[in-house]
Amino acid sequence: MKYLIVNADDFGLTKGVNKGVVECYKNGILRSTSIMCNMPYANEALQVKELCPDLGFGIHITLDAGKPLSSPEKVNTLVDERGYFKRGFPHSLDDADVDQIRIEIEEQIKKAFSLGVTITHMDSHHHAQSHSKVIDAFIEMAHKYNLPVRSTPLDKEKIIKAGLKTVDNFIYTFYDDGVKKENLLSILGSLEEGTTEIMSHPAYVDDELVNISSYHAKREVERKILTDKDVLQFIRDNNILLTNYSILK
């Protein structure tokens, strides 16, 4: 059987992102999203869950955007003079203290569990989990909170060796120049048996998103493709089961 998890990263970043998640669930193939717990609209998770009962919510561990949930004094090697995370991953973490990374990851996990929705998995913004200073704390916290995780080509071997549950295949090519309907249909046509995650970033683009994310215009295109009638029909015709990370728990 082919089990497909289409996950929307960046839930909570803006209202337009959250609105895009709802749209792609109700009228498209999205069944999973991951929450940026340090962002202003993360608290909309329960409200969205009521609109989208089968939507899975993961944690999008964020270490290079916005402010930490920990007090700046506790994670001073992660922040700039204004108290924001240092920008420019991966080099932004070059001088980071691994214990401080662990502290902040756990704060974000605790925030996620306080939002009133069942947490299905954990992944990370800009694949920060693959950084040599992050991966061990990421694995430790996933074990502690019994969470399946996304695995990328850079960290899959270590994640599997650690005994964490993860998908069989992770597809990250539906992004930027790869945001085309024919590309998504090609990806769907090449799905292997087992579990596959396709990473996505759908949204309604508003001024807030334009001001904080360089990746914004393509989010509108993603939203339209993920709700395209040809894509929906392909899923039906090929017996692909849409699901979320709860299938791994």
UniProtKB/Swiss-Prot annotation:
Reported cofactor(s): Mg(2+)
Keywords associated with the record: Carbohydrate metabolism, Hydrolase, Magnesium, Metal-binding
E.C. designation(s): 3.5.1.-
PANTHER family: CARBOHYDRATE DEACETYLASE, YDJC DEACETYLASE FAMILY MEMBER
Identification of the protein by name: Carbohydrate deacetylase
Molecular function (Gene Ontology), one example: hydrolase activity, acting on carbon-nitrogen (but not peptide) bonds, in linear amides
Family classification: Belongs to the YdjC deacetylase family.
Oligomer status and interactors: Homodimer.
